[in-house]
A protein has these predicted regions:
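A structural motif corresponding to the C-terminal end of an alpha-helix
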Residues: 29, 94-99, 127-138, 218-225, ...
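Short, histidine-centered active-site or binding-site loop motifs used for metal coordination
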Residues: 68-70, 107-109, 194-196, 234
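N-terminal pre-domain/capping segments
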Residues: 1-90, 96, 150, 158, ...
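Active-site acidic/histidine proton-transfer and metal-coordination neighborhood
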Residues: 75-162, 172
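Hydrophobic faces of well-ordered beta-strands that scaffold small-molecule active sites
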Residues: 4-10, 34-36, 61-66, 103-105, ...
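Histidine-acidic metal/acid-base catalytic patches
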Residues: 1-7, 16-27, 55, 146-164, ...
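Charged helix-capping and loop-helix junction motifs
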Residues: 46-51, 81-88, 117-125, 176-179, ...
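Acidic-and-aromatic substrate-binding clefts and catalytic sites of carbohydrate-active enzymes
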Residues: 11-18, 36-49, 71-74, 79, ...
């Protein structure tokens, strides 16, 4: 049997360690696949340097998570909203140059966002069409507010457009409510992490209150074929154990999720 790949986020939000130490710990834990944050922020080392280091370590980049600065303006008739299109097109161009086959995008930020509308769809259509011309998949993520994924997937029909299912957001913001069947065969990516509903904690799976068997069954039943991708953040009580133990524990949790995927 071919096992699903296991992957992990390279987080720039980890505490008390550099991103280089994060990458080293990820490799030491046994991960071979990662996703990177391409947020166009003033990081040291920069996102370009991080990508170079990741590749030097022999790690495979499965997708880039694009930034979401001003993303609520996507739905507004203003200059910030218009500027999102060339920004994302430039990100896609860079991903193509670096052989990154998929990007993940948010559709909103914060708890209140402008209601979805045709203005945003027209902009997203340009972004998705350009990605399609580069043979790049675009996966839109469920964030804090319901309805956006359904609206976008109902209006954008390109084969390269799908969703990224985020388990933590599903638990704390969606109260475990999502009609997975609406996205059948369009689930391109996942962000698997846990919380106890007190916040978006990015805990290691099984350290919170998510029903993992239910989530994995929903993903399997609706055609998700991709890696077991966990999105962890090194902070809180995890700091006592050290970065290497954190990612080793994360790898073990991902392996348990892999076993759930393979269970008949």
């Amino acid at each position: 049997m071919n096992h699903r790949e296991i992957a992990v986020a390279i987080s720039n939000d980890n505490q008390e360690v550099s991103v280089t130490e994060t990458i080293d710990a990820i490799k030491n834990a046994g991960f071979k696949n990662v996703f990177i944050q391409w947020y166009n922020k003033d990081w040291n080392p920069s996102q370009e340097e991080q990508l170079k280091y990741v590749r030097e370590q022999g790690l495979n980049v499965i997708f880039a998570h694009l930034g979401y600065q001003n993303i609520n303006d996507l739905w507004l008739e203003n200059e910030n909203g218009e500027n999102l299109v060339p920004r994302y097109i430039n990100d896609l161009k860079i991903c193509k140059e670096n052989n990154i086959p998929m990007v993940v995008m948010h559709l909103t930020s914060k708890s209140v966002a402008p209601i979805y509308n045709e203005i945003g769809i027209k902009r997203l259509q340009k972004i998705v069409d350009y990605a399609e011309s580069l043979d790049i998949q675009v996966a839109f993520e469920n964030t804090k507010t319901k309805g956006y994924l359904e609206y976008v997937m109902d209006h954008i029909h390109n084969k390269n457009a799908g969703i990224c299912f985020d388990s933590g957001h599903y638990h704390v913001y969606f109260d475990d409510e999502l009609d997975f069947s609406k996205f059948k065969d369009r689930i391109f990516a996942v962000h698997l992490h846990d919380n106890d509903k007190s916040g978006d904690l990015h805990l290691i799976p099984f350290d919170g209150t998510l029903n993992w068997a239910n989530i994995i069954n929903n993903l399997k039943d609706n055609g998700y074929q991709g890696p077991v991708t966990i999105e962890l953040c090194y902070r809180y009580d995890y700091l006592k154990d050290g970065i290497n133990n954190f990612y080793k524990k994360g790898y073990e949790a991902a392996y348990k999720l892999q076993e759930l995927f393979e269970k008949e």
